[in-house]
Every structure is written in structure tokens, then in C-alpha cells.
Amino acid sequence: MSSGGRFNFDDGGSYCGGWEDGKAHGHGVCTGPKGQGEYTGSWSHGFEVLGVYTWPSGNTYQGTWAQGKRHGIGLESKGKWVYKGEWTHGFKGRYGVRECTGNGAKYEGTWSNGLQDGYGTETYSDGGTYQGQWVGGMRQGYGVRQSVPYGMAAVIRSPLRTSINSLRSEHTNGAALHPDASPAVAGSPAVSRGGFVLVAHSDSEILKSKKKGLFRRSLLSGLKLRKSESKSSLASQRSKQSSFRSEAGMSTVSSTASDIHSTISLGEAEAELAVIEDDIDATTTETYVGEWKNDKRSGFGVSQRSDGLKYEGEWVSNRRHGYGCMTFPDGTKEEGKYKQNVLVSGKRKNLIPLRASKIREKVDRAVEAAERAATIAKQKAEIAASRTSHSRAKAEAALTAAQKAQEEARIARITAKEFSPSFQHRENGLEYQRPKHQMSCDDIEVLSTGTPLQQESPELYRKGTTPSDLTPDDSPLQSFPASPTSTPPPAPASRTKMAHFSRQVSVDEERSGDIQMLLEGRGGDYARNSWGEEKAGASRGIRSGALRSGQPTEDFRTRGSGHKQPGNPKPRERRTESPTTFSWTSHHRAGNPCSGGPKLLEPDEEQLSNYKLEMKPLLRMDACPQDTHPQRRRHSRGAGGDRGFGLQRLRSKSQNKENLRPASSAEPTVQKLESLRLGDRPEPRLLRWDLTFSPPQKSLPVALESDEETGDELKSSTGSAPILVVMVILLNIGVAILFINFFI
């Protein structure tokens, strides 16, 4: 029983149309994964039969199908190229026509696995043709190349080699390419005409100077040695001009060549061996009949111009190479051995031949082989002509099949509309992707625009808000704000835009309060720390850091008052500035049963070099609440090396200079905590604190000592600094010794 409807696949595709036994049957429209690609037409038990397939790029196929592949006959439109003909299991062939809609270049013949193979005819945009054998998309075997009149032939300037018949033709965007060309003038860019290869007067340069012997030239060319020439030599100047102009021709292509996208099949590295060519009449044509290898004239063959210039003999890569005979329009001949279009031994015009008997024998054999190859090539061209006519018939049938496929596609759209009126037909799958892509771009914009606002607004923590937690890299302490029960006094209103603050917090365990100390440092070029972004309800994150130069990690702990807070979503800014990593670990003192926060220092405990602090002692309480929130590790990047920001200990100025980079050219402003008073009664409120400012002092940030126990670790860590200095000095001495031994 046949029915129909709409079915959406998990991969984003959909089918709307008729089906039978759970398979597409009848007429319907199906889109590929994520809406890419679309087939509209007739179906038979889950497989396409006749219809139109459209790719997201706009390429289309109209024709018959079998077992999910293009099979039978159909028309493919791909860029500027259109293929009409037979298809076999998804590939072009056996007979078909591929044509460029822009300039009329085309191939008509047999195909195999999607490439020209067998016999066929290639027509170029200027009207020139090749008829003969093909193998793997290239001319190979025997064939005939016929050019158009010289005045109409395509001008070729590029030294690259491609053709509409080769594998590389897929990237030409429908441009017709012209092989079989050679440079016409050695002192100019690699200018040539499509189908013209013969070069007359190959000995014109040789006869100018005896010093420029052919054997010497061929030897130097083969060994790729530098030739010493006089700067005043005409040949030297012309060679330089040729090299310069060839480079210019590489980068600047004429509009004619650009429109045709035609290239030549010569190796232009040896363009200097080519010689000056006489002016060719605009009506002159050239024909090559013979062997081909790898899309080039190679083997034996005959090339002849309509003005009487003719060459019979051996070829290699579109050049005369081997034994052959050259006949000039005036009837004179030149025969012997050629290398890269240059006669290196044999009989020249008006010259006494050398070793005439042996050379003449080899030349005669080469000429006979060339004539035989020409005869075979003409036979192959006739076979190619018959294959061409058969391919044209298949192309006509493909046009008829394409029209039927379009009609089936129209019926399929009507059927899909009946089963699902809300179904929207799209020409290709691009529309299916665009909404999601645009949405993702908008999300990125929102995140990127919101980030600078948080960076430019460092504020003290207020209840119910998320602290910025951005502190300068060179600050001795990190910010670990606990959740206060009341709002602390606001920060001074007189600070500048470039001021940065760091907070230092101590917790009063019993009173559920905390004491915050605000440190201000001027200069806006600090590398800033940030909290990682957490979801609501996540435990508080604790930053962590590793000591410089492999020093042991000192532990210290903080705790909150039970408030869960999200962090500042700025984890990436720090990482981009420096490769330093930090790690914090939690630690509990063995001698203290309480797991509270860090204690404040006594005013007479240590004399700080950079900050002046005056604090009054806190009242000790009997009990301490348990730490209920696990600490999370945070990894961030430092600015110049490993810095132990989590170490609450004092450092000497000399150690700070070695381990900490200067924060900025501006001097930091030091704030002194004048007084800190606690009430006698335990109250659940924030401890009162005041801030007073002292004049700026030229100093570097230092770290505070929180526990007496870390004093022992301080000694061990500070003792490693001289060792590092000694190691660096020894390393420098070793490098200097190596430098002296090897380079002096």
C-alpha cells in the first residue's frame, strides 16, 4: 500500500513525498545531511530513478540513476563546464561531450572513470583541434594536432602547462587552454601561439661567434654550470633581457591570455636555448601528425607549416630532440642530431658535414619512423572522428533525459507540497546552514563585547555581585574574597582609569566576617589574573601557582563563609600574555585544630619594604567553622616566568628584581592600613577597616607572610636563587668556550 508524508532524519536531512514499505517510492524531495544537497524526482523502493540533484555550490545533475549513483544518461552542470552523455556507476562514460559554456572549448569522445580515455576530439577556444588517442585524461598514443591561422591562434604567455583534457582542467573554471606552443622570440617573454611549435633558423645565434660553440653550450646546460660571458656581449644582454621579461610575463598576463587562460607545454627554464623566429604570416597554419606521450609531442612525428617549413624526426616534450631533418621554405635542408631544438651535430646549411655517413643513416631511420608514425596517427584520427560522432548522439539523448528529469522534479515538488503544505523547497542546501551559523557569530560578538567592560571596571566585592578579581601580575598576593555580611566602604573616587586594585582578605571565623585590604598600583600595563567562569552553585575557585625555577610549592589556604559565587569569565586574557603556569594547593596546619583563614600580621612582626601596614590583633575565638567548600585548582599564565604569587612571605628587594618584572614605568601608589579595630563582643558583622594613602614610593611589590611555619620553607627557597645564578654563569662560560673553539 502506497502512502506518503514527511520524515525528518537525525542528521538534519528530510524527505517529503510518497513511500512504500518504509522506503521512498513514487515522487518526493529529499535533502542531505544538515540540509546540504537536494534531490527532487522519482523514486523506486528507496533509490533515485529519474530527477534533478542540486549541490550546495549550485552544481546540478539531471538524468537517470541506479542504485543511488548516476547511471545511464544525463547532463551535469559544473561551473562553466557542461557534460552531456553516458554515465557508469557515478562516473562519466562511455560516450559523452564536455563543453565550456564561455568560449566553446570542448571534448567529444570516449571516457573511462570520469576521464578522457580511448579516442576523441578536443577543440580549443581558438578553433584548433586534436584528434587521436587518450589515456587517463591526457593525449597519449597517436594523434593529429591542427592549428588555426597564426593570426587567430591564441597568444600564450604563461610557462605553466594545463589543458582542458587533463586532470588539472577541473581547476580552470571553464577556461579553454591551449597546449603545444613554443616561444617565438628568445629575447621576449615566453610568447607563443597555440599549436605552433616549429622554430626556424636554429643556428642563427651559433654562427655569430665561434666562442659560443654548441658542444660547450650543451655541456654547460647539462651540467648546469655558470657560464662566464662578456658584459658587452649581445647574447649576454639579450639573455638578461629575456630572463627579466620572462619574470615580468609571469606576474603580468595580458588580457587576451587571461581571458583564454591558455598555457603552453614547454619547459621555460630552457627558454634561452630558443632562437629568434622570423615573422610568420597571419594565414600560416601548422599541423603535427605523430606520437604523443603525457599530453606532449614525444616520439616520432612530422610537423609542417603551410609556408613550407617542415620537420621529420624525433620529438621530446614538444621539442625537436634526437635525429631528424628540417626543411626550410626555400628548399634547403638541415639534418642531424638535435638537442632541445638546437642542432648539435650533422649537416648544416652551407657547411661541410661531419661523419656524414653515420649521421645520415641515423637521420634516414628517424625520418622513416616519423612517416610511419604519421600514417598511424591519421588512422587513429579517423577512429577518433567516428567516436566523436557517436558521442554527439549520446549528448543529444542526454539533453532529452535532462528535460524528462526536470519534469519529474516538478511533479515531485507538487507531491511534497500535498503531503506537507509547510514544506519549503530550496534550490540548494546553503539556506539550511545559514541560521545556525549566523546565530553562532552573534553569540561570539556578545561575549567579545562584554569582556572589556569587566576588564575596565575593577571594584571591591559587594554582596550579591560578582567581583572582578583582577589584580596586577606583580602583586604579591592574589585576591580571595570571602562573602561579607555587609557592604564595605566604597573605593576612593579619585582614582584614575589606569589604576588597578588588589584585595587581601582575612576571615574572622566566629563572626562570619572578613577584613579586606585594598592595594592600588598605577600603570595600566599589568597582566591581569581572572577567575574562571563557573556555573551558579559551583564551589569557589582558588588560583594556584608554581614557584620559579622549580622551587617547592608552598601551600596556603583560604575559606569562604559559605557563599557560592560565579567567577569572572575572563580566563583567556592571562594565557595569551605569558607561558607561566600557576597551581595552588590547600594546606592545613598540623598544630592548629581550626581550619580557618589566614591570620593578620602583628605590626611589629616584619618591616615591609614596599607597603606600610599597621594592624591591631584580632580576638581569638574558641571554635572555628568547618571548611565546607572544596577548593578548585586554577591554572593561569604569567608574564615572564614562574612566579609564586600564592606565597605569603617576604622577599628581599634583590630577589624581587630577579623573579618579578617591573609592572610599569609609573611608580605604584602604596596605601597604608592605618587602623583596624575589632569590638569586644562577637558580632556577625564585617570588621571595620580604614584606608589612608601615603605618598608614592619607588619600590616593587612584596608578598606578606601569613604563617610562621613558612619561614623555614622561605630559607630553603631563597637559598636556591644563588645556585641558579651560579648555574647561569657557568652555562654562559661554557657557551663562550664553545663559541671560541668553533668560530674563532
UniProtKB/Swiss-Prot annotation:
Disruption phenotype: Mice are viable and fertile, but have defects in balance/motor coordination tasks. Jph3 and Jph4 double knockout mice exhibit atypical depolarizing responses, irregular cerebellar plasticity due to abolished crosstalk in Purkinje cells. There is hyperphosphorylation of PRKCG and mild impairment of synaptic maturation. Exploratory activity, hippocampal plasticity and memory are impaired and there is abnormal foot-clasping reflex.
Family, similarity comment: Belongs to the junctophilin family.
InterPro entries: Junctophilin, MORN
GO-annotated biological processes: exploration behavior; learning; locomotion; memory; neuromuscular process controlling balance; regulation of neuronal synaptic plasticity; regulation of ryanodine-sensitive calcium-release channel activity
Repressor in keyword set: no
MORN repeat residue numbers: 15-37, 39-60, 61-82, 83-105, 107-129, 130-152, 288-310, 311-333
Transmembrane portions of the chain: 724-744
Gene3D superfamilies given in the database record: Histone H3 K4-specific methyltransferase SET7/9 N-terminal domain
Protein name as annotated: Junctophilin-3
Function text: Junctophilins contribute to the formation of junctional membrane complexes (JMCs) which link the plasma membrane with the endoplasmic or sarcoplasmic reticulum in excitable cells. Provides a structural foundation for functional cross-talk between the cell surface and intracellular calcium release channels. JPH3 is brain-specific and appears to have an active role in certain neurons involved in motor coordination and memory.
Ranges per topology, Cytoplasmic: 1-723
Membrane topology, as annotated: Peripheral membrane protein; Single-pass type IV membrane protein
Keyword presence, Nucleotide-binding: no
Sites of Phosphoserine modification: 440, 457, 475, 506, 699, 706
